[in-house]
Amino acid sequence: MKFTVRVKPNSKKIFFRKEEDGSVTIAVREPALEGKANEAVIETISREMKIPKRKIRIVSGEKGKKKTIEIDP
């Protein structure tokens, strides 16, 4: 399963929200430095969707705010 995520690093609030266009917006406290925000995004997806982190990977957009996430079955 693949889906698009918009990330808001350095956020005061942490949230996981589905948008009308089918994408997901995730706000994390971690900065977009050295992959910290990416790790937080994977942790947030894992917690919200109740799937192991090892099954989640960022397919594209590792250095941008718009990312494509893939979840292995």
Swiss-Prot record:
**Gene Ontology cellular-component annotations:** cytoplasm
- List all membrane-crossing ranges: none
User: InterPro entries annotated for this entry?
Assistant: DUF167, YggU-like_sf
Q: What SUPFAM superfamilies does the annotation carry?
A: YggU-like
The record ties this protein, via Pfam families, to:
DUF167 (PF02594)
Q: NCBIfam families given for it?
A: DUF167 family protein (TIGR00251)
User: Family assignment?
Assistant: Belongs to the UPF0235 family.
Among HAMAP family, the record links this protein to:
UPF0235
Q: What is this protein called?
A: UPF0235 protein LBJ_1240
Q: State the organism's lineage.
A: Bacteria, Pseudomonadati, Spirochaetota, Spirochaetia, Leptospirales
